Amino acid sequence: MLPVLFWENSIGRSKSSDVTVDDPTVSRNHCVLLRRKDGWYVSDTDSKSGTMLNGKRTRGRAKVLIDDTITIGGTSLIGKRGEEFQQPLHSSWFFSKVSDKPAMKSWKLMLLITFFHFFMCVQAMFWNDGTNTMAPLVLFGALAAVEWGFFFISYFVIRRVNFELESLALFLTGIGVMMLIRQSERSAYVQLVAAAIGMIFFCIIIKLIEDPDKVNKLRLPAMICAVGLLGVTIVFGKITNGAANWIYIGSFSFQPSELAKIIFIFIGASSLDVLMTKKNLLEYIIFSAVCVGLLALMGDFGTALIFFVTFLLTAFMRSGDFKTIILAVAAAIFGVTFVLKFKPYVADRFSGWRHVWEHTQDNLGYQQARVLTYMASGGLFGVGIGNGFLKQVAASESDLVFGLVSEEMGVIVAFTLAVAVGAMFIYARAITTRSRSTFYSISACCAAGLFVVQLSLNVFGATDVLPLTGVTFPFVSAGGSSIMSCWGLVAFIKAADERTYSVKR
């Protein structure tokens, strides 16, 4: 007997299949057995010999009942109830790590986060300048109102049973908002408003992707929207630091590529029976190539790199085939060589990489040298919010925010922020094995992976471990488009938790 362990199960000859059938007449990825609210279904995935249900060839999804016979190649499989399977299941990483120990109460976690943000407020009130001492307190009040308002809506209106993921996001968001109060009070409030809008996006996206089957119908409109956003940026975008990635409408500005990240994750994931068809894979490859190409044309190579690495992660999760990854990397190397030849300012960044102390007075090393210097002066506990010198350097609140946090709040807090982002990836990895659909599993892991890639480029770029690419620190860097995008991406991780839709208070 072969156990069926997941909501969506691939059946085939491949060792990577959820149900492996040792039969040469069976295709490597032959069909998918999936569970929905109204029962179980089988769907052929472009196999050579097709899939038969009770002697009849299936077309699309076919409902499977107990004792029905599924025939693939020369093998027949009969559906039985789970209690009839008597063999012990082998322990794995997926199952052995699940704990019944209750988590900390959500309201207690929120209190800890609020206290931390309040301590930041007090520290900012007693800065060296000594002026406008009450501004941080007013901002903290507004921040606390947004955070607790979001908590009460989630807990008592939507009636969700868990709030751990949102707490991590609120912790990071609040730090980003409070760090801005001694740089630009207006920017701090803009960031807070953008975060509140992002929380609304979070709720909308979770509702939008509630049914993984209906989501597939939105793929084409979403593709058109993403390509349209990037195309409009090429035409109307204003060139800033060599990249035309901002659109200005009066005093309002936004970065369409940040919103395109959400769509990119959305397009990359599908339910398993759709995912394993050649048409779906080809569509995604073409869409990814167009997005990365448009980003390269506008000169936003940092975001292009994030998209490409996310594509690699998605492609591997979809196929488990290293050959696909190797071919994609080879194509990327060719593309990078082409870019370096025709975009000399990009090559200049590489020439300054690992040599910032030789370029402390020019664009190749000025920012990184200051980050390293002021991080050292901040030590473990920092010099206090508003008392640092890095805030006088361009992009200190966005591209260099890791250095700013290290100087003003200490390396311990800065490292904690990086760990918090990494914890989102661990959370996503842990919950996806129990997701209701491969759509949720892939989108959650890829969204969390995107955060980790973005974090790495930001932290290591600012500290000269990698070339400075100008990408933001998730949730913490200043930027309305960035914070809204981050909250939108968190929705994919939240949706992968089966408790989000199946359990209410």
Regions found by a protein language model. Give the residues of each.
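Hydrophobic alpha-helical segments of polytopic membrane proteins
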Residues: 278-297, 301-341
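Forkhead-associated
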Residues: 2-75
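A juxtamembrane structural motif centered on a specific transmembrane helix
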Residues: 456-505
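Hydrophobic alpha-helical transmembrane segments
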Residues: 142-146, 196-201, 407-426
